[in-house]
Amino acid sequence: MRVLIACEYSGKVREAFRALGHDAYSCDLLPSDDNSPFHLTRDCWDVIENRFSTLRGGWDLIIMHPPCTALAVSGNRWYGSGMPKHQQRLDSIEWTMALFEHAKKHAPRVAFENPVGVLPIKPTQYIQPWQFGHPESKKTGLWLHNLPPLVETDN
């Protein structure tokens, strides 16, 4: 399966898919932490649309990690209504929602994650790391298109 992990420079998710035998790539405006040849230092909009000739064919799955700084409710102190960075929040909401729609036009299955935030559409589900074998707690929303909700592996 051809997989794109957008807005990722760590390579962690990309490498997990590659370890399972998928043709996975990551992209971000930043270079990858692991200097992988499977990371594209490009704008995710272009990579989603495959506007370059490096890869043939489209994506089967796109997973996105859009920046959450302005979107998370934890930032209300700086990004809330009437605050100096409120317009940045509004721009981030518009960008993230447009990116989700853009990805859905270019792949049959799409997911993106973000912590509890201010996006205008509710996530398909909320998950916690402890539901999947990690001791941390961080409520995270998943917006899924043509994908089933995750089923917890630990509780």
Feature names for model-found ranges:
Residues 1-155:
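Conserved active-site and SAM-binding loop architecture
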